[in-house]
């Protein structure tokens, strides 16, 4: 089944439950078709069936495909499946993430302890972005929203590894600002505080007598609807690009501004060089995009 040309299509990673599922529900409510990619196959199929049952008059608004975001073959299959099923991809909500192994400073000195968290939380976002951009560029543009976190601006010994991955997602998101001028693709990040999701449960179920659990148990929560509203703002407002949007307790949503540039890093001569460099690099990347599309087969 292929959607009509004016029908918007969204891809959601980690969409089987939690924030991803809530955003899928919001998108479907607006008539946007959704493809969920996840490794939780039972939950994924159940979520797709549940949302399809809610769509009166249209039996397939949501489809599911098994997706490991750390593998290019799975990510490519996800976006090609979305294109084959619904006609293209306009929106990508890159939400897949894990928190296990986050308190890693004194864990055993074993390689796998440090591998999985950044592999999913950072590399997964990078791989999905690269594939999403190609499909969106073919379609004339689109928008990507990454799930970062308030943790991307803070520090915590107890969850140091997790916090580091979310700092990386913030940096990656802001670094994609030029994509809008290259191929009309906007990239933003939603940065929630603690939500009552499965990931938070994983913290509370940590082994041992960790006093950090008490802090998490009593920490203020952000409502799921606040997070969803933030994601929808980033999708719908075409002026929002390379933006990091905090969603906080008390139904507060606000942009986390960047720090000011360090004046010591520039001179008048260097600033003039940067001004002349911008149009050159834009053309350079447009040519790289053409080569990437040819290489990918779009």
Spell out what each predicted region is.
Residues 41-42, 66-77, 111:
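The beta1-alpha1 cofactor-binding region of Rossmann-like NAD(H)/NADP(H)-dependent oxidoreductases
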Residues 149:
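Residue(s) in the substrate-gating loop at a strand-loop-helix junction
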């Amino acid at each position: 089944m292929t959607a009509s040309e004016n029908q918007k299509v969204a891809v959601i990673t980690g969409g089987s439950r939690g924030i991803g599922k809530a955003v899928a529900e919001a998108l479907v409510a607006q008539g946007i078709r959704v493809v969920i990619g996840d490794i939780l196959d039972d939950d994924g199929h159940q979520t797709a069936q549940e949302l399809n049952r809610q769509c009166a008059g249209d039996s397939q608004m949501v489809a599911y495909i098994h997706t490991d975001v750390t593998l290019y073959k799975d990510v490519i299959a996800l976006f090609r499946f979305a294109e084959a099923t619904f006609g293209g991809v306009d929106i990508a909500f890159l939400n897949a993430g894990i928190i296990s192994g986050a308190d890693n400073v004194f864990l055993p000195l074993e390689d796998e302890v440090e591998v999985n968290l950044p592999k999913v939380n950072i590399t997964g976002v990078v791989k999905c972005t690269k594939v999403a951009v190609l499909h969106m560029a073919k379609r004339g543009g689109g928008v990507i929203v990454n799930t970062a976190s308030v943790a991307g601006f803070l520090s915590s010994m107890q969850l140091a590894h997790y916090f580091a991955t979310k700092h990386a997602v913030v940096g990656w998101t802001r670094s994609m600002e030029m994509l809008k001028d290259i191929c009309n693709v906007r990239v933003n990040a939603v940065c929630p505080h603690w939500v009552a999701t499965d990931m938070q449960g994983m913290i509370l179920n940590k082994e041992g007598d960790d006093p950090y659990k008490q802090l998490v148990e009593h920490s203020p929560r952000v409502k799921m609807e606040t997070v969803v509203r933030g994601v929808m703002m980033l999708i719908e407002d075409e002026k929002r690009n390379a933006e990091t949007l905090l969603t906080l307790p008390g139904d507060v949503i606000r942009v986390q501004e960047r720090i000011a540039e360090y004046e010591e890093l520039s001179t008048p001569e260097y600033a003039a060089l940067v001004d002349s460099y911008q149009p050159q690099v834009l053309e350079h990347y447009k040519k790289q995009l053409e080569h990437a599309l040819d290489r990918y087969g779009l």
